[in-house]
Amino acid sequence: MEWASVPEVRKKAGVSEEDYTDVEIQEFISWATKEVNSKIITRYIRERIGFIDSYRSNKIDGSNTTYFVRNWLGKYLADSNFDNSIDVSDIKVVKLDRSTSTESEVVVSSINSKACSFVLSEAPSNCELYVDYCVTSVDPITPDSFLWQCTTYLAAGTSLVGNDGFDVKFGNVSIKPGKDGGKGKQLLTEYERLLDQLLVNINGGTAYGDMAEKI
């Protein structure tokens, strides 16, 4: 789950393999994906699992293992631990036995981002279930154009801009200050504009604006 490609970032930044290797560009993309993800997710902690509707009954009856989060409408389960992957590590489920006042974590076997559902390794009974998770209003698996563009511009801009005279490090990548900083600043400004529009779209505001291709 990384929302940019090495060729597109190279094209936007105007850098060659002599400037950055593919591995180094990929590190910019990985960092940019985490950063954009942090702007579009909403976190829910210890949400009690219970009946939602006839399809999402969330029965705790000793036979059911599939459950849905309450905040599912128009949402997708998201990357909550910022490893650029959406998997079972992004959800935590605990069961509470009121009779003994004991609590234990339940193993999650699989998750479905689009359905906002998850499958447990066991069918719980006689307990309460609670879940920690994150959701986003933008499909993180097949990202829309704004999500892709935001990440591309952020990765490209970051590859060109230093920070107050000091080297900036992202993983194994070291950015030297002042390297074509004018264009880098332009790219980051465009990223901020695209991110603002993306957040407006997510919050149900204006229709999609024009994509930026001029820089």
Q: Which residues does each PLM region occupy?
A:
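Conserved short "hinge" loops at termini or chain/domain junctions
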Residues: 1-68, 73-148, 162, 189-215
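Protein-protein interaction interfaces in oligomeric scaffolds
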Residues: 170-189
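Short, hydrophobic/amphipathic alpha-helical patches that form generic packing surfaces
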Residues: 149-164
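Short, flexible active-site-proximal loops enriched in glycine and acidic residues
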Residues: 166-168
